[in-house]
């Protein structure tokens, strides 16, 4: 991909540094999909509420996406002198090419489209911050990503077109802004809730997998997950949020014995055909940002 004339032609960032952050993105995707048991989601135990995808699809998908993550970082660095609102337009072709490789790797199955959007944004934000020698923390990464997305919800969801996308329909019916709204707001569900929750559990000495599973429950309880709403409507979303909140109120996932509750929750999600894919995407970001 040739860089537009408005971009800096080169970046001062070392290839090793770019590859380090790209590797974290790949590890984040693998960490999420291998985490088990996850209610309604593909994991090492079963395919959740999905009949068209399996664990191996996610492994192949993550590997295909890994090769593109350095491009997002490089573009973020090379566009560092541009107005942040102009960056998203330049990221789109990279994202579309990355999606193409994902679909080729999975024979047409959409495994990680949401993660391409969110990880692409965060990787570009990391590139920009590094290029400008600015403080790189989870908060600054997410606020920089948010600056790329100013006006995104208005442009893409608030429309009166007769042919609505699934996202536009859910916004008009339920007021859910999904991945676009979370990105434009700077990922508050991650920064204000999931990430501090996860880090606190780790500080308390909880097993990292149990801590991640408990954090997933938290995200499921508070996230207006458009993946769930598209499958089960408002009723399905509210049910899933209530069930997750109930498990948290009972103490969450603190011991291996608590996994029985998650297995039952998984069975119920499968019966209802509900998959909290939006919360899974946010869990990927949570783990990724926890490494920074």
UniProtKB/Swiss-Prot annotation:
Pfam families in the record: CitG
GO molecular function: any one? triphosphoribosyl-dephospho-CoA synthase activity
Highest rank taxon of the organism:
Bacteria
- Output the Gene3D superfamilies linked to this UniProt entry: Triphosphoribosyl-dephospho-CoA protein
Per the record, the GO terms for biological process are: prosthetic group biosynthetic process
Q: Which reaction does it catalyse?
A: 3'-dephospho-CoA + ATP = 2'-(5''-triphospho-alpha-D-ribosyl)-3'-dephospho-CoA + adenine
- Which E.C. number(s) belong to this protein? 2.4.2.52
Q: Which InterPro entries match?
A: CitG, TriPribosyl-deP-CoA_syn_CitG
Q: Which terms are listed as keywords in the entry?
A: ATP-binding, Nucleotide-binding, Transferase
Family note: Belongs to the CitG/MdcB family.
Show the PANTHER family listed in the entry.
2-(5''-TRIPHOSPHORIBOSYL)-3'-DEPHOSPHOCOENZYME-A SYNTHASE (PTHR30201:SF2), TRIPHOSPHORIBOSYL-DEPHOSPHO-COA SYNTHASE (PTHR30201)
Q: What does this protein do?
A: Catalyzes the formation of 2-(5''-triphosphoribosyl)-3'-dephosphocoenzyme-A, the precursor of the prosthetic group of the holo-acyl carrier protein (gamma chain) of citrate lyase, from ATP and dephospho-CoA.
Q: Which NCBIfam families does this UniProt record tie to the protein?
A: citrate_citG, PRK10096.1
Q: What's the name of the protein?
A: 2-(5''-triphosphoribosyl)-3'-dephosphocoenzyme-A synthase
| Source species | Escherichia coli O157:H7
**The gene coding this protein:** citG
